[in-house]
Each structure stands twice: as structure tokens, then as C-alpha cells.
């Protein structure tokens, strides 16, 4: 995945597996090899079946948050024959174990609790693919809640999104890549050579503006 990101001309990417950050260490190591900055993160499923992205400044915070999220998953084991293997990778493409719980399940945390958990580890919560029918905030809840505020949201490419949901918000454009061929080419360009810290600072600053930035 990281190598393909380099081929696509991407300088900074986020790795956000479902309900775990356990593969972030290997992704960051691969990023050093390929010259790609990797932001450690997760895509957490709330009990309402809403996907919330969590971006973290450091690997340790992401891993600790990931352990707490994993504890909130139901004790339902993955069935590889049905859902595929949930591999932990090390040293490139070398499998180093598996995770037992089925990661695509919802946690027992509400949307608000997921956001609070991410923030408690210094992370940035961002609603994922809000305009996608499944697991997007609009499709799952029927609306974009007024509170907590979501100044930054992610939208899914090629799917219409209501204007009220995006007005005044900073939009991240998602490839939501689960396969190599899904990885998009760059959407945003920063004036200076970007780093992961630059991207996180931009998102955090936009989040801090809150409702002041909205019409």
C-alpha cells in the first residue's frame, strides 16, 4: 500500500484500519523506505454503525487508543473463510500474526464516545465518508448532528453530498482504499514540502475554528 502511494505521487498518507492500529508500525517503517510520510490512525465503528476516523500525532498514542477500541469490540471471532485473514504485518509483507476479534464489527461506543476517546489520546476525530450510504454519518443517522461539531469531514469520491453537510466545513477527499487499485492520486497540494505533522496541524487548526468558520 505504501509503495503504491509512492507510485501515485503521494507524500503523506494515513493508514486507518478498522478498529485497530496494530499495522501502523510496519506502515511507518515502509514509509521511511519509500519516502512517504505515514499518519497512524484508525477507522472506528460506533454502535450506531458510523465510521469515525482518528488521526494521531504519534505511534504510541495510536497504539494505546487502538487497544482501548479493541476492548470495546464484541467477543466475536473472525472467520477467515468468510471475511479473510486479519493479518499483522512486519518487515514489509511478512505476516507476523492475526487478530482474533472480527474487526468490521461495531464497538459498543456511541459516536460522541468514539470522538472523546480519540481526543483523550491527543487524536483528531473526523467523520468518515459522510455521504456514503453505508456507515456514513448521513446515511446512518439521517443527518449531520449539530453537536458535537464536526468542522472537518471526509467525503467519498463520486457520490453526491447534501450542501448543508459540507457548507463551511473543511473537506478531506477519501479513496477509502482497501485494494492497491483504489489508491487515488493526490488531491491536495501544500506550498511547502509537506510532512505528516503539517497535515495534522492543518486539520487540527481547522477543527479548532469550529462553528466560527461556518456561515
Show which residues each predicted segment covers.
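Charged catalytic cores and adjacent phosphate/nucleic-acid-binding surfaces used
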Residues: 1-10, 21-64, 102-103, 116, ...
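Active-site beta-strand/loop signature of hydrolases that rely on acidic residues for catalysis
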Residues: 13-19
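Active-site gating loops and adjacent loop-to-helix segments of metal-dependent hydrolytic enzymes
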Residues: 55-99, 143
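Alpha-helix-centered segments that form part of catalytic cores
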Residues: 85-121
Amino acid at each position: 500500500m505504501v509503495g503504491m502511494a509512492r507510485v501515485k505521487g503521494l507524500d503523506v498518507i494515513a493508514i486507518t484500519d478498522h478498529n485497530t492500529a496494530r499495522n501502523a508500525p510496519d506502515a511507518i517503517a515502509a514509509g521511511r523506505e519509500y519516502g512517504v510520510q505515514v499518519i497512524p490512525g484508525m477507522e472506528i465503528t460506533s454502535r450506531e454503525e458510523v465510521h469515525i476516523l482518528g488521526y494521531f500525532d504519534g505511534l504510541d498514542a495510536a497504539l494505546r487508543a487502538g487497544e482501548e477500541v479493541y476492548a470495546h469490540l464484541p467477543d466475536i471471532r473472525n472467520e477467515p473463510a468468510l471475511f479473510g485473514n486479519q493479518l499483522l504485518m512486519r518487515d514489509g509483507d511478512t505476516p507476523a500474526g492475526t487478530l482474533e476479534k472480527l474487526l468490521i464489527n461495531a464497538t459498543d461506543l456511541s459516536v460522541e464516545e468514539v470522538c472523546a476517546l480519540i481526543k483523550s489520546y491527543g487524536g483528531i476525530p473526523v467523520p468518515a465518508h459522510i455521504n456514503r450510504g453505508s456507515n456514513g454519518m448521513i446515511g446512518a443517522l439521517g443527518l449531520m448532528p449539530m453537536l458535537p461539531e464536526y468542522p472537518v469531514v471526509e467525503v467519498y469520491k463520486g457520490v453526491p453530498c447534501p450542501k448543508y453537510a459540507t457548507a463551511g466545513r473543511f473537506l478531506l477527499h477519501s479513496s477509502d482504499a482497501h485494494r492497491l487499485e483504489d489508491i487515488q492520486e493526490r488531491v491536495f497540494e501544500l506550498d511547502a514540502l509537506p510532512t505528516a505533522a503539517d497535515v495534522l496541524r492543518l486539520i487540527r487548526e481547522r477543527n479548532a475554528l469550529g462553528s466560527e468558520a461556518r456561515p
